[in-house]
């Protein structure tokens, strides 16, 4: 099971590398949809089957509508693929090599995978009484996000802030 989740994680990142290398909207939308499906599979394999199903239905359902409209509006006679342009292909390969380097560096044994060590789930007991404790995975995941994962929330907030300016710059009229 661990290998399946690892392969899904690698394909998840490869899909986003494929999207960020700026191919045609047809292939960019396809890579985002595949990455979204793989992300839902990762959530389901981690024990959040209901959350994975809801995200799959809502997120990918909305994405199908948006990308269908985008593809209809931006049809090209000769769509740009990842191998049709040297710049696009090199951006894809550089991103892929960076991911491979990061995986080798993280699994070399010298570094911890997340940057800190979890002693166990005894600190994350949500429902407990006396010596008996019951750990819910989804509640402890939310608690970990706000306690141990504060850097992730700060980075996600910063990325949303920067994406506002990127969207403004892309849609700004040039006279």
UniProtKB/Swiss-Prot annotation:
Per the record, what are the reactions this protein catalyses? a ubiquinone + NADH + 5 H(+)(in) = a ubiquinol + NAD(+) + 4 H(+)(out)
User: Do you know which Pfam families this protein is assigned to?
Assistant: Oxidored_q3
UniProt-listed Enzyme Commission number(s): 7.1.1.2
Its chief place of residence is: mitochondrion
The GO terms this record gives for MF are: NADH dehydrogenase (ubiquinone) activity
Q: Which residues form a coiled coil?
A: none
Quick one: a GO biological-process term for this protein? mitochondrial electron transport, NADH to ubiquinone
Enzyme type, top EC level: translocase
Report the transmembrane regions from the record: 1-21, 24-44, 51-71, 87-107, 113-133, 148-168
Q: Might you report a single GO cellular component term?
A: mitochondrial inner membrane
What InterPro entries does the database record attribute to this sequence?
ComplexI_Subunit6 (IPR050269), NADH_UbQ/plastoQ_OxRdtase_su6 (IPR001457), Nuo/plastoQ_OxRdtase_6_NuoJ (IPR042106)
Domain of life of the organism encoding this protein: Eukaryota
UniProt membrane topology term: Multi-pass membrane protein
Query: Which keywords does UniProt give here?
Result: Electron transport, Extinct organism protein, Membrane, Mitochondrion, Mitochondrion inner membrane, NAD, Respiratory chain, Translocase, Transmembrane, Transmembrane helix, Transport, Ubiquinone
Q: Where in the cell is it found?
A: Mitochondrion inner membrane
Query: What's the stated role of this polypeptide?
Result: Core subunit of the mitochondrial membrane respiratory chain NADH dehydrogenase (Complex I) which catalyzes electron transfer from NADH through the respiratory chain, using ubiquinone as an electron acceptor. Essential for the catalytic activity and assembly of complex I.
Subunit structure as annotated in this protein's UniProt entry = Core subunit of respiratory chain NADH dehydrogenase (Complex I) which is composed of 45 different subunits.
Q: Which family does it belong to?
A: Belongs to the complex I subunit 6 family.
Q: What is the name attached to this protein's record? A: NADH-ubiquinone oxidoreductase chain 6
| Taxonomic lineage | Eukaryota, Metazoa, Chordata, Craniata, Vertebrata
């Amino acid at each position: 099971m661990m290998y399946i989740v690892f392969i899904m994680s690698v394909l998840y990142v490869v899909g986003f590398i494929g999207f960020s290398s700026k191919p045609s909207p047809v292939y960019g939308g396809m890579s985002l949809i595949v990455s979204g499906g793989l992300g839902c599979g990762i959530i389901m394999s981690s024990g959040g089957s209901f959350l994975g199903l809801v995200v799959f239905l809502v997120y990918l359902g909305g994405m199908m509508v948006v990308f269908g409209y985008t593809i209809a509006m931006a049809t090209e006679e000769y769509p740009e693929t990842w191998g049709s342009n040297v710049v696009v292909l090199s951006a894809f390969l550089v991103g892929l090599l960076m991911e491979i380097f990061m995986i080798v560096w993280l699994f070399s044994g010298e570094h911890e995978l997340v940057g800190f060590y979890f002693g166990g789930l005894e600190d994350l007991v949500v429902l407990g009484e006396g010596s008996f404790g019951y750990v819910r995975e989804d509640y402890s995941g939310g608690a970990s996000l706000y306690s141990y994962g504060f850097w992730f929330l700060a980075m996600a907030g910063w990325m949303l802030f920067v994406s506002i300016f990127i969207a403004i710059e892309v849609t700004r009229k040039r006279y």
